[in-house]
Curated annotation (Swiss-Prot):
Record-linked PANTHER family: PEROXISOMAL MEMBRANE PROTEIN PEX13 (PTHR19332:SF1)
SMART domains hit by this protein: SH3
Species this chain originates from: Dictyostelium discoideum
Keywords: Membrane, Peroxisome, Protein transport, SH3 domain, Translocation, Transmembrane, Transmembrane helix, Transport
Listed Basic and acidic residues bias regions: 560-570
Segments of skewed composition (Low complexity): 32-58, 453-543
SH3 domain: residues covered: 393-452
GO cellular component: peroxisomal importomer complex; peroxisomal membrane
Cellular localization per UniProt: Peroxisome membrane
Biased composition annotated in UniProt, kind: Polar residues: 544-558
Protein name, UniProt field: Peroxisomal membrane protein PEX13
Annotated region described as Disordered, given as residue ranges: 1-91, 453-570
Length: 570
């Protein structure tokens, strides 16, 4: 790559001061970056400028200390509508003049042969399209061998083409390139490729030589090859799917045939079962027939009848050899009259046969039924005896000698003369017994042991209806002070008193008992620790009734008391 010629605004003539090359009406290039100033000795030194804008809009530059005002940028030709220069630079038209916003050999902002500002061949170039040239003029854009910018050769360029192109298409390209006006491909106005303004390569992102032919290049080839590969893969997958469907159909066919064979075997098994049932029925019929024939033979023998074979033999023998028999009997000096009398005997009546059949088919089952009933009665008696032994024989039986009114739901009520079957003896003073269909705990001191012989001599009346007990049952509630009095109740079996609060004192006084000469007074009180104690005061115990052993019972709460139903007995 050959070197680019020196730029006009950077030339130094013989080490003298920097010369600004501008033509008539030329525009000075804006100074950007470090500026070169000429030292008194002829050398150039680089100083940093500080640019500011004055009130008129022109930048001012401070070089080395004093403030230097930079000239105002003149109007551009496409902004003013006229030619801003009297001549066009060599090897291509710019905006005017030989330097500034134009370049030689296709320069853009400051390019030579390609480089990038706003685009090589940007605002007027040779050998490359103009970026934004006039509406078709060869002066302000385009010209030479390439197209103009907005219209380069659309509205007046040579060699025809799209909206302003030469030898190609696009919006203003040359030889097929894209962009706003490029030659030999390119981007926004570059020569020989390039992006937004690069030469021989990338600018803002173009691919350089890849887009020189105006086609997709490697990307298009990759896309096309990928498309072919996807089609091949799709065909392979479709083939496998068809093969899988074929295998599925074969599996269904094999499964159906196997199922049909299994159903056939099952049907054959049912058929063989039916055939065997028929054969069994026929064999049972034959067996029954043989047994019946033998049974009839036995009956015939018992009835004195001969079988058909014997009778036929007798008939034949009587026909063919009766005379011979008589002759032989005569020769043996035997009396034939007895034999003839036996033959002339009358046959037995049918009643005998009916009697035998009735005795066989009716009498025998009756006898068997009676035997079974006797066996059942024996088993029942043995079970009853074992139950009695289990209920009363294990621990024996006791007789109640005093009445016992249950104090809890687990107690067994007793009356004088009741026979109690002892079930268990969990404690020394309290046993578990059963009486009158009820079971529960009863005090041992209220009973006495008896022998089995004394049970039959018990003529006591268990329904002791002569006891007229006048009681008053009171239920106290702390919340609403409810008092309920039930008097003159005839209680035959039991008497219950419920206490709902740990702070209540319930006095159950049984003062009137016409049948006994004793008086039992019970005071139920509660202490502060919530444990109910049963304190029994025996004031008048005329008949020396023993007092039941003390039991510590848990006090019922109000909720438990309300849950229990209260039943009045009249």
């Amino acid at each position: 790559m050959r070197r680019s010629p020196p730029k006009p605004w950077e030339n130094n003539s013989g080490g003298g001061g920097s010369t600004s090359m501008t033509g008539s009406g030329g525009i000075s290039r804006p100074m950007s970056g470090p500026q070169r100033t000429t030292s008194p000795g002829g050398g150039s030194s680089t100083t940093t400028q500080t640019s500011t804008l004055n009130n008129t809009g022109s930048p001012s530059t401070s070089v080395g200390g004093p403030l230097v005002t930079r000239p105002r940028t003149p109007m551009r030709p496409w902004e003013s509508g006229g030619a801003g220069s009297s001549s066009i630079d060599s090897f291509g038209g710019g905006v005017g003049g030989s330097s500034g916003y134009r370049s030689s050999y296709g320069g853009g902002y400051r390019d030579s042969y390609s480089s990038g500002g706003y685009g090589s061949s940007g605002y007027g170039s040779s050998y490359g399209s103009g970026g934004s040239g006039g509406y078709g003029s060869s002066l302000y854009g385009g010209g030479g061998y390439s197209s103009g910018g907005y219209g380069g050769s659309g509205y007046g360029s040579s060699y025809g083409g799209g909206y302003g192109s030469s030898y190609g298409s696009g919006y203003g390209s040359s030889y097929g390139g894209s962009g706003y006006g490029s030659s030999y491909g390119g981007g926004y106005g570059s020569s020989y490729g390039g992006g937004y303004g690069g030469g021989y390569g990338g600018g803002y992102g173009q691919r350089g030589y890849d887009n020189m032919d105006g086609k997709g290049g490697a990307l298009q080839s990759v896309v096309s090859s990928g498309h072919s590969w996807m089609e091949a893969l799709h065909s392979i997958v479709d083939t496998f799917s068809r093969f899988s469907r074929l295998l599925d159909a074969n599996f269904d066919a094999v499964h159906g045939s196997f199922s049909s064979i299994i159903r056939l075997c099952q049907s054959m098994s049912h058929f063989s079962y039916e055939i065997m049932a028929i054969i069994k029925t026929y064999s049972l019929f034959r067996m029954f027939q043989s047994v019946a024939s033998r049974f009839l033979r036995v009956f015939r023998y018992l009835l004195g009848k001969k079988s058909k074979s014997n009778s036929s033999n007798n008939n034949t023998s009587s026909k063919f050899g009766s005379n011979a028999i008589t002759e032989s009997l005569r020769q043996a000096n035997m009396d034939v009259s007895d034999f003839r009398n036996f033959q002339n005997e009358k046959k037995q009546s049918v009643g005998t046969l009916i009697l035998i059949i009735a005795a066989t088919f009716i009498g025998v089952p009756m006898v068997i039924g009676q035997l079974l009933n006797l066996r059942r009665r024996g088993q029942a008696s043995r079970l009853d005896k074992g139950w009695e032994e289990q209920q009363g024989g294990g621990y024996g039986q006791v007789k109640a000698i005093y009445e016992f009114n249950p104090e809890t739901t687990r107690d067994l009520p007793l009356r004088v003369g009741d026979i109690v079957n002892v079930i268990d003896k969990p404690h020394d003073n309290w046993w578990v017994g059963e009486c009158n269909g009820l079971s529960g705990f009863f005090p041992v001191d209220f009973t006495e042991k008896i022998s089995p012989n004394d049970i039959n001599n018990n003529n006591n009346n268990n329904n002791n209806n002569n006891n007229n007990i006048n009681t008053s049952v009171q239920i106290y509630d702390n919340n609403n002070g409810f008092n309920r009095n039930n008097s003159n109740n005839n209680l035959n079996n039991s008497e219950y008193s419920d206490y709902s609060s740990s702070n209540n004192n319930n006095n159950n006084n049984n003062n009137n008992n016409n049948n006994s000469n004793y008086q039992l007074q019970s005071n139920f009180s509660s202490n502060n620790d919530g444990i109910s104690k049963n304190i029994i005061y025996n004031n008048n115990n005329d008949n020396q009734r023993p007092i039941s052993p003390s039991k510590t019972s848990q006090q019922l709460s109000r909720s438990e008391l309300m849950d229990k139903p209260y039943v009045e007995e009249s």
